[in-house]
């Protein structure tokens, strides 16, 4: 038996009493483990194996990197309460988990991303803005996804200071001197451009608070969604759920505002 550290990305029932647990492990990358009997009513495994929990367990990796690994006994587990209590925070954690799972190959060494996701979960549990934490992952995952926009400088002139916009044609930012070269640039405000550039390089350990306006947050999400929709073609179910949730929230806000207006 081996002690394995990991983050649970998702679980699903297997046969009557077992669970398949998708885990980002610290040393072995993405793996799927079988937890026998975890669905039985009195199983200690079943209550502990929750998505986004960070755990150490006794078990085994898949033999010859094929098939399933096994979870025999949990040694330690960290469950983030805010992710359980807040459906929006949980949804953004699920989005990050899905993106990591769909970006990398099975068994690929991902210690850096393991540490990054642990930090991300901690920041979410501390109450930092969940959209922004997810946006940072979305931006930084573009590199392993093979898109890697150039956020550093204008590729034509090398200019790194000044006014910029995002250009899909040039796969990154272009300076205002070259706006006429791309009629389909996204026409972003400069705060949005600033944060896009920062998010591409920022270390989550540096973030202790987030104060970004709703207008800028919408701009950031618009760019990120544009890249994922048009240049990658990747949209996890968690992303669709988040969009639906925000649509419901906006409908409720409008309903309340209209109701208050009529009551006057």
Curated annotation (Swiss-Prot):
Family of this protein: Belongs to the RecO family.
Top-rank taxon: Bacteria
Keyword Isomerase: no
Transmembrane segment boundaries: none
Source organism per UniProt: Leuconostoc citreum (strain KM20)
Keywords noted in UniProt: DNA damage, DNA recombination, DNA repair
Biological processes per GO annotation: DNA recombination; double-strand break repair
Function: Involved in DNA repair and RecF pathway recombination.
A Pfam cross-reference name: RecO_C
Disulphide-bonded residues: none
Annotated Gene Ontology cellular component terms: bacterial nucleoid
Protein's name according to its UniProt entry: DNA repair protein RecO
Matching NCBIfam families: reco (TIGR00613)
Record's keyword annotation contains DNA damage: yes
């Amino acid at each position: 038996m081996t002690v394995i550290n990991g983050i649970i990305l998702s679980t699903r029932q297997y046969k009557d009493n077992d669970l398949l647990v998708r885990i980002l492990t610290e040393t072995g990358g993405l793996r799927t483990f079988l937890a026998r009997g975890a669905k039985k009513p009195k199983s200690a495994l079943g209550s502990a194996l929750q998505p986004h929990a960070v755990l150490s367990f006794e078990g085994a990796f898949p033999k010859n990197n094929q098939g399933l690994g096994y979870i025999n006994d949990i040694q330690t587990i960290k469950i983030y309460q805010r992710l359980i209590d807040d459906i929006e925070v949980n949804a953004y954690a699920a989005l990050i988990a899905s993106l990591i799972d769909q970006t990398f190959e099975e068994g690929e060494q991902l210690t850096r991303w393991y540490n990054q996701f642990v930090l991300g979960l901690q920041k979410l549990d501390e109450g930092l803005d969940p959209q922004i934490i997810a946006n940072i992952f979305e931006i930084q995952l573009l590199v392993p996804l093979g898109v890697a926009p150039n956020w550093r400088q204008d590729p034509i002139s090398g200019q790194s200071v000044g006014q910029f916009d995002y250009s899909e044609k040039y796969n990154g930012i272009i300076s205002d001197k070259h706006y006429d070269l791309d009629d389909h640039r996204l026409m972003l405000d400069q705060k949005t451009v600033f944060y896009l550039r920062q998010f591409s390089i920022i270390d989550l350990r540096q973030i202790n608070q987030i104060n970004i306006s709703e207008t800028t947050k919408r701009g950031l999400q618009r760019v990120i969604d544009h890249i994922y929709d048009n240049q990658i073609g990747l949209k996890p179910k968690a992303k669709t759920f988040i969009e639906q949730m925000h649509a419901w929230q906006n409908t409720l806000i409008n309903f309340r505002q209209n109701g208050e207006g009529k009551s006057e």
